[in-house]
Amino acid sequence: MHTMKCRLVIGPPSVISSGTLLADFDGVSVHYAMGAENVRVAEAHPQLVSFPEHHMASILCLQYDDEILVTGSSDSTCIVYDINNSYRPIRRLRHHTAAVLDLAFDKKHIVTCSKDISICVWDRATGALLRQLRGHTGPVNAVQMRGNTIVSCSGDFKVKLWNIDTGKNIREFEGHTKGLACSQFSEDGRYVASAGNDKTIRIWDANTGECIKEMRAHDNLVRSLHIDSVSGRLISGSYDTDIKVWDMATGRQMLDFPRWHASWVLSAKSDYRRIVSTGQDPKILIMDFGADVENIEMLEGGGPASGPFGLPTSPKGFI
């Protein structure tokens, strides 16, 4: 069992109070934070880095690469941090008028979506707003990029594809009967998967808009999707506390981890040998299929966090 320590906290000076304790116990499968009422004594506090530029409300999403970390917040802004310069803020992105719910970026662009029903495309190098995409009629809950194409999904039941250079809506996928929480491109950009409050997962042909597969997937809102294009598998996580693995080609359920979390599953990701999930419990669970069956790592945190309009928050970065 591995224990993992928090090395750095970025935020306002008050982000860690004097009563906040961080406990780390070797050999025990927990890692958690506690309030002042607990009598345990922490071995050490993580380093706190505070800058004049910081978020004034909950951070709802983040992404990072080797150079920058970008965060989106309920304060309607994003902050870009320089990872190689002690995580100093480079700039703040301001244009949304409500909470930033998701973001994505590549070497040229940063794309953000918001409860204000819009998507913003920013120049990564300068922070300039290049264009604002409008077309959804509900909160835009998720965005992802593949080349010069953006996929978005919304509480308006729709998935949309956009050209990042022109801002034009290329295609629209209709069929879901309730609001959507997540959408994903396949690695080659040929397929799009979407899911949400109607408890189903749909797989679409990105070029034609045809719904290829519809899976009656879960007993509650499907909060998270992740496509592993190498294996052709799709991982879903739901408010029903289950994580499931699907065959993309056939729509067949391959694996089911019932009641994997004690509460809502907020995010589930995978690579060639692991599934990593976060929940409202609050836990991070790591299933390593390359190790012994009992080798499950669990990291526990503070109390459950609730995001806008009933959707709990969860970072999208995957370590």
Please give the residue ranges for each predicted region.
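Conserved strand-to-loop turn within each blade of WD40 beta-propeller repeats
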Residues: G72-D75, C113-D116, C153-D156, T177-A181, ...
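WD40/WD-repeat beta-propeller blade-loop signature
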Residues: H55-S58, P89, H96-A99, L129, ...
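A structural motif specific to WD40 beta-propellers
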Residues: P46-V49, R88-R91, A128-R131, K168-R171, ...
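Conserved beta-strand position repeated across blades of beta-propeller domains
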Residues: C61-Q63, A104, Q144, Q184, ...
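Intrinsically disordered, low-complexity acidic/Ser/Thr/Pro-rich linker and tail segments
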Residues: M1-I68, G72-I79, R273-R274, D288-I319
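WD40/WD-repeat beta-propeller blade N-cap
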Residues: P52-I59, R94-V100, R134-V140, E174-L180, ...
